[in-house]
Amino acid sequence: MLDYKFIKENVEAVKQNIKNRHMNADADKAVELYDKRTALVTSLQNLQKDRNDNSQSMKQKLSPEERQKLVDQGKAIKEKIAQVEAELAEAEKALHEAVSKIPNMAHPEAPVGKEDSDNLEVKRCGTVPKFDFEPKDHVQLGQDLDLIDFEAGTKVSGVKFYFLKNEAVFLEQALTMYGLNILRKHGFKPFITPDIAKEEILYGIGFNPRGEESNVYSLEGEGTCLVATAEITLGGYHSDEIIKKESLPLKYCGLSHCFRREAGAAGQFSKGLYRVHQFSKLEMFVYCTPEESDALHEELRLIEEEIFNGLGIPFRVVDTCTGDLGAPAYRKWDLEAWMPGRNGGEWGEVTSTSNCTDYQARRLNIRYKDDDGKNKFLHTLNGTALAMSRAMIAVLENYQQADGSIKIPEALVPYCGFDRIG
């Protein structure tokens, strides 16, 4: 959430940012409501002063008529205060709702665009494999090697669910331990997080827990949702808290299941493990001072690069365009791995990392005490270490062999206990 005063003083820039992001929000309405709230606050303060003056006057020596007049005035002031307080509460609610729809400001260097095709490639790492055979996609590999059962997943749970089987189970656990050990080396505190969060926490992070376009599974009548990422639970961990500055940055990593409705998702790249309703993910989350957030954002991206370089998976880094940014993100980097099973080979997103500045902290009321003793909103960042399903696609497709087997990346062999599948 943006600061109310910032919107008031920078309304044209805020409106342009909304336009660049292709989002629906009304900055002018927010300013109008802000002005209304300000006027009501002033009115309330004046009435409270009148009430105090009336109370002081009652302490003087008065005739019965004078006292009754002050009593009547006091009652009128009290009624007016109650009326203005009610109007102020409504204005506060309307202002909060209007501002909550306004996205974070985008980084000035973020490419302006509408969708992921407008993202800007900034680097490539690794060598795209050249096969002397027709490479299979992970769906066919999973079927041939008895690793993934989509048919049983659909029968038991519905479409976009699956069973991992046999060596694929060990492969997912190997990816998990590989990622955890890298994050531990970088000073991250590990968590296994709840799979359910309150709606107000999702709202604070920037997810829409309700509505037809919501990507979230809500638990009817509970006021809770299945989490789409550990960003939600790790971000809510310090809600309504004041954190000591000397303890910052706080670097957390959370392992969780992730549940996503994927409403409206379709197309060839939605097949198999790429876009499913449930998967496991290792997520990074950082709380820091505003001065640290840009550097820490680079650090998160470099950790993601380290993870995929260590796996020997070719990838590229893209600077996400304004239209492809989530509402909380100030800037976002995506890592896209090479996936040979896509039409003979294409890039597919495997991680992202976002600097959300103070957008989430304002919504969740997370602050730190600065050197001057003032409580200020801190910055939050998040980044995917490993989304296991997509990482598995990259491993299976890039490491497939001519005989139909899968070679295990060297970094994963100690965790798997085997070096080949098939």
Swiss-Prot record:
- Cellular component per GO, a single term: cytoplasm
Localisation per UniProt entry:
Cytoplasm
Q: Which GO terms describe its molecular function?
A: ATP binding; serine-tRNA ligase activity
What keywords were assigned to this record? Answer: Aminoacyl-tRNA synthetase, ATP-binding, Cytoplasm, Ligase, Nucleotide-binding, Protein biosynthesis
Is the keyword Hydrolase in the record?
Answer: no
> Where mainly located?
cytoplasm
For this protein, the record's SUPFAM superfamilies field holds: Class II aaRS and biotin synthetases, tRNA-binding arm
Pfam families from the xrefs? Seryl_tRNA_N, tRNA-synt_2b
Q: Does the keyword Nucleotide-binding apply?
A: yes
Q: What pathway does this protein act in?
A: Aminoacyl-tRNA biosynthesis; selenocysteinyl-tRNA(Sec) biosynthesis; L-seryl-tRNA(Sec) from L-serine and tRNA(Sec): step 1/1
Listed under GO biological process in this entry are:
selenocysteine biosynthetic process; seryl-tRNA aminoacylation
Q: Which reaction does it catalyse?
A: tRNA(Ser) + L-serine + ATP = L-seryl-tRNA(Ser) + AMP + diphosphate + H(+); tRNA(Sec) + L-serine + ATP = L-seryl-tRNA(Sec) + AMP + diphosphate + H(+)
Q: Which Gene3D superfamilies match?
A: Bira Bifunctional Protein, Domain 2, Serine-tRNA synthetase, tRNA binding domain
Residue sites binding L-serine per the record? 229-231, 283, 384
Q: What are the EC numbers?
A: 6.1.1.11
Q: Which residues bind ATP?
A: 260-262, 276, 349-352
- Give the EC class as a word: ligase
Q: Its function?
A: Catalyzes the attachment of serine to tRNA(Ser). Is also able to aminoacylate tRNA(Sec) with serine, to form the misacylated tRNA L-seryl-tRNA(Sec), which will be further converted into selenocysteinyl-tRNA(Sec).
Q: Which family does it belong to?
A: Belongs to the class-II aminoacyl-tRNA synthetase family. Type-1 seryl-tRNA synthetase subfamily.
Domain description from the entry? Consists of two distinct domains, a catalytic core and a N-terminal extension that is involved in tRNA binding.
Q: Per its UniProt record, what NCBIfam families does this chain match?
A: serS
Quaternary structure annotation from Swiss-Prot or TrEMBL: Homodimer. The tRNA molecule binds across the dimer.
Q: What is this protein called?
A: Serine--tRNA ligase
Tell me which species this is from.
Treponema denticola (strain ATCC 35405 / DSM 14222 / CIP 103919 / JCM 8153 / KCTC 15104)
